[in-house]
Swiss-Prot record:
GO terms for molecular function: antiporter activity; proton transmembrane transporter activity. This is Potassium/proton antiporter CemA. One of its GO terms (cellular component) is chloroplast inner membrane. GO terms for biological process: potassium ion transport. The gene is cemA. It is a multi-pass membrane protein. The chain crosses the membrane at residues 7-27, 114-134, 154-174, 189-209.
Amino acid sequence: MAKKKAFTPLLYLASIVFLPWWISLSFNKSLKSWITNWWDTRQSETFLNDIQEKSILEQFIEVEELFLLDEMIKEYPETHLQKLRIGIQKETIQLIKLHNEDHIHTILHFSTNLICFVILSGYSILGNEELLILNSWAQEFLYNLSDTIKAFSILLLTDLCIGFHSPHGWELMIGSIYKDFGFTHNDQIISGLVSTFPVILDTIFKYWIFRYLNRVSPSLVVIYHSMND
């Protein structure tokens, strides 16, 4: 009976780890065709408004300028001009397809992640008892560690997350989250998050040391500051 009680929280922890991957894989396959049909039906009349987006418009203008340049430099026969027009038409259709695929990809990933969040939230609420057991195990494990090990672990974690060498790691992680949600890579937004998010974490961490650790374990705070210096 005791082994069963110990096994249940571990099984619950493993399910939390693998459940997002399974949900993402399942819903990606089931939602893709539905979202594609919905997008093609809905956007068939409104694409001319969306094509004003900067990236698509720049590519379209580039193709058009190449056509006009060729027409100005040489006098082509009508058959050749017709081929150029067909080429521009094909390129425009390709741009439209890429535009639609990007939007479908964004909607699909955002919907999948939203569904995954809702399911995991409900799963966490239903498994509240298992979470309490896991939390008690974690607290017992941390309590049995010496203050030196605790201070070293805190210092290592803070250096990894908010140290001077952490921006590249934050950039990779935020870029990965952006890609997972299907958003287009944006250097300005990512740079802004990288420059502000670690600062916010650093402030929260210092406040936590001041309010919590100073009250619970003053010796740990002394060791931490000694190692940090």
